[in-house]
């Protein structure tokens, strides 16, 4: 075996050294060729293909995640001015990729009041809270409870409240179709005169008057579906003095809602109170979770269709998501009440409020507690001598007819709809089209000239006398008939010659007046025939001036002319006889 192997090795080296080969064993540049594997190319190609497929799948997953976060995630940044703990919305993808909420997310007790349905729990709460209230607060609580027993709230699925006619009207008119309901005739004086608790101006502007004790109003239509992610509205506080005795609430309610109760204090209602309290179906003590509202602030409420979430904004910043899974028709609700009639918001109630830490600290340190004069004690609204006038509050509602303070609502178009609907803008009455009218422009360039006198005929005063005689007295001498004719008639002015200096016969005047009938007297006594310059009598029958060639048909005038002619003839005869 060993010999055979050596022989084979020698023969191999001998073949390498033979002249038939291009290289020799001693050649230093000789590199042995490795054996070629026929499957290596196929293996490398398969590896590259698998690697590209893996990267493609990863890219596809990233694109899907990015698309979901962009279009299905939260639309705006979250703010937390109260330093509250944040939570995440439900759902696997939301938990993994959703944005982290910095606001407070409450349960869905808004749609399911909970404690109100349990009579035992409600009775225990009433026994605890009602003694802390004033008589007027207890009265309002009982009235609201009876009201909702007689008229239960309409808890319908979102978008089912409106009929086809209302939907078409909203499409046609847009935001112009929405308005706040007017005040109920609740407050009257001893004479039966209506004392409105509030006045609605321009459909969406509300002003609570000094007669207000406790009242509220709602919108005529519920929140619409604007084909966007959410719907949003804002309320601007135009008037609310500091240390006011009026407290107002802004929120969402169902209908019918007690008109004498502010939002948030009855079933199926949520409200942002001006004191900073957040009320959800809570007529009792509420927690202060929000900033206090002052004049100039803007409060916003939004509703997300997909998750049924209600969120609140303050001066353009989102505060929190209040509740979720709300799928019913909601109406905008605004109300106000006089805090002087309550114990909760007067001195004693404020000291018992656990959120008023500063009051208790000041009281423990012996410092004076600054409370408004009207809120030092509880007043009785049923006692006329103890009634308090409410401080006026003015609020303006913005449904999208102007820009929102909340920027994201403008970008995402969360308005209630178009401003003018499908009908469009009404005709313009600002004068832009009228200015193009040539005739009207000419009329503006050449305005008509009016007389400086008191009326059309001058400063004329008429005194009534007997039926047969009417006298006229004027501050200025009237024109004669000839002067009047020359002014009034172009034809007479151009073709006739007038003589205004004719003399009158005073003796014939009085006789002629007695002989004429009433009609003749009235015609001859016209103010136009009176000429103070010639000193004519009132009822003078002197002949009128006539043009050249005109014939005077008055017989008296003819007799006068004959006498003048006879006098002329007699004078001529005398002259001849003298000669």
UniProtKB/Swiss-Prot annotation:
Protein name: Protein SSH4
Biased composition regions of type Low complexity, renumbered to the chain: 509-525
Keyword match RNA-binding: no
Biased composition annotated in UniProt, kind: Basic residues: 555-579
InterPro entries: B30.2/SPRY (IPR001870), B30.2/SPRY_sf (IPR043136), ConA-like_dom_sf (IPR013320), SPRY_dom (IPR003877), Ubq-SigPath_Reg (IPR050618)
Lineage, uppermost ranks: Eukaryota, Fungi, Dikarya, Ascomycota, Saccharomycotina
Segments in the Cytoplasmic topological domain: 1-44
Cellular component annotations (GO), alphabetically ordered: endoplasmic reticulum; endosome membrane; fungal-type vacuole; vacuolar membrane
Transmembrane segments: 45-65
Ranges in the topological domain labelled Lumenal: 66-579
Domain B30.2/SPRY: 166-364
Keyword annotations: Endosome, Glycoprotein, Isopeptide bond, Membrane, Phosphoprotein, Protein transport, Signal-anchor, Transmembrane, Transmembrane helix, Transport, Ubl conjugation, Vacuole
Disordered, as annotated region: 499-579
Modification type Phosphoserine: residues: 358
Similarity-based family: Belongs to the SSH4 family.
Location relative to the cell: Vacuole membrane; Endosome membrane
Function: Components of the endosome-vacuole trafficking pathway that regulates nutrient transport. May be involved in processes which determine whether plasma membrane proteins are degraded or routed to the plasma membrane. Confers leflunomide resistance when overexpressed.
